[in-house]
Amino acid sequence: MSRFIFVTGGVVSSLGKGITSASLATLLEARGLNVTLIKMDPYINVDPGTMSPYQHGEVFVTEDGAETDLDLGHYERFIRTRLNRRNSFTTGRVYQHVLDKERRGEYLGATVQVIPHITDEIKLKIREGAGDADVAIVEIGGTAGDIESLPFLEAARQMRVELGSSQSLLVHLTLVPYIATAGEIKTKPTQHSVKELRSIGLQPDILVCRADDPIPQSAREKIALFTNVEARAVISSPDCKTIYQVPRGMHEQGLDAIVVEKFGLDLPEPDLGEWDRVVEAQLNPEHEVTVGMVGKYIELVDAYKSLNEALIHAGISNRAKVNILYLDAEDIERDGTGVLESLDAILVPGGFGDRGTEGKIAAIRYARENKVPYLGICLGMQLAVIEYARHVAGIEKAHSSELNPNTPDPVVGLITEWITEDGQKELRSADSDLGGTMRLGGQECVLEADSRAAECYGSTHIVERHRHRYEVNNNYLPQLEAAGLKIVGRSADGELVEVIEVGDHPWFVACQFHPEFTSTPRDGHGLFKGYVAAALAEQKAHKET
């Protein structure tokens, strides 16, 4: 039977519940437990798949094709377990399932209400998400006091009663602000946040207090006194140089020891050697490179969260600090490519819509013609094909039917059908719903043995995660390949282009999938490690000339 740890937040949002949950999971996993994590989001959207990155940040895709909150990316980067669609759900998903059951008559004519029907559905999904894990850490989105979060908090309260104190814990994350004019930190917001939880029947077992600097013992004791929490269970969580320091910091304060004790478990101390090596490599780089990321959501770096982390991981593997220069594609479209001249490498990430398209294509052309290492991801591959078609293959009006439905040469077009992993045929048209209708999740890819991609992966057969509706149009492949474009990766059935390379270039690789979703700080990812290594080589060659 699984044990459950509920994680809530108070005072303000964006305190780091996801990092806290992932760090605790890391510590428990290092003690030998099978740990999983669940994220519950209180918005009405069924999933974040159709939400703007400006609203929600990155959409993280799981191996089984679920479009989820970016916190699941944190979870997978911190623990060894791969998550699935049961590890993330929203208010919208819960209500959708309850209403479907009502339509089918499963409630036998009862009046369907928030309590018990919505809360029962939430509890069911929590237990399904836990599966056979020893411990399930359940992060409740939002902030204590939000109306939207109340059904989730009520479900957590009920589960705590059902499970008992030896099978469930509540960790509450709060803010302890420093008031410069007073010259002191203030504990009152934390006290009121806990008071809010207690008013609905939830008493925290552990408080994790976020602050700029370590919280003095006297302040922790004061918080403990007024929140009915043990002083040792008031954990100080100051800002760190890197998020990968958080597990070690929490272990040193005894967070995992408190959890293990309260659950009545006898477990060995965690071995955090891998994490110490990650932190040491990240904070003590021997080299430094600058990567230009040409995108359209650069005002919000969380829109590229997994990508940012994957570059950091590749830097760790190469003992290099990777500086990311975020470049607005529309600026390049308007002002030209001069801003690219100081870069060691260029990257065009995924995205949707035509805004900034020509700026991205200009950046890709600059990378190709000036032999600058280039990595294209999803749309970044499609635009690389369009750029090559226009300027090398002589298809001057080449475009994507997504970005220009009237193009006479759609070298990138809508995928109208494909075969899923379970052998089912998926059919799509331009009129299909936007939500949940893409080619999603892990898909097999076969690489050419002599390709750079195969060299990076160390294999010719890989599985990577996808999130797209459009693909390279196979009708144009003969013309593109005749002009020198190398198709080095295809889907398992050979029908879809997955990876391209440019032969007469030191490192020009673009892929239809999202390799950033499977990169981790302890292992990195072959494609990103190869990319950063190429950037270092480019930098060295540039200095020598």
Curated annotation (Swiss-Prot):
Single Gene Ontology MF annotation: identical protein binding
One GO cellular component term: cytosol
Gene Ontology annotations of biological process type: 'de novo' CTP biosynthetic process; pyrimidine nucleobase biosynthetic process
Chain positions recorded as Mg(2+) binding sites: 71, 139
Keyword Phosphoprotein: no
Positions of L-glutamine binding: 54, 351, 379-382, 402, 469
A Pfam family recorded for this sequence: GATase
Residues binding CTP: 13, 146-148, 186-191, 222
Residue ranges occupied by any Glutamine amidotransferase type-1 domain in the UniProt entry: 290-541
EC number: 6.3.4.2
Residues that, per the record, bind ATP: 14-19, 71
CDD domains reported in the protein's UniProt record: CTPS_N (cd03113), GATase1_CTP_Synthase (cd01746)
Reactions that this protein is recorded to catalyse: UTP + L-glutamine + ATP + H2O = CTP + L-glutamate + ADP + phosphate + 2 H(+); L-glutamine + H2O = L-glutamate + NH4(+); UTP + NH4(+) + ATP = CTP + ADP + phosphate + 2 H(+)
Location of the active site: 378 (nucleophile), 514, 516
Pathway this chain belongs to: Pyrimidine metabolism; CTP biosynthesis via de novo pathway; CTP from UDP: step 2/2
Binding site residues for UTP: 13, 186-191, 222
Function: Catalyzes the ATP-dependent amination of UTP to CTP with either L-glutamine or ammonia as the source of nitrogen. Regulates intracellular CTP levels through interactions with the four ribonucleotide triphosphates.
Remarks, miscellaneous: CTPSs have evolved a hybrid strategy for distinguishing between UTP and CTP. The overlapping regions of the product feedback inhibitory and substrate sites recognize a common feature in both compounds, the triphosphate moiety. To differentiate isosteric substrate and product pyrimidine rings, an additional pocket far from the expected kinase/ligase catalytic site, specifically recognizes the cytosine and ribose portions of the product inhibitor.
Quaternary data: Homotetramer.
Entry similarity comment: Belongs to the CTP synthase family.
HAMAP family: PyrG
Protein name: CTP synthase
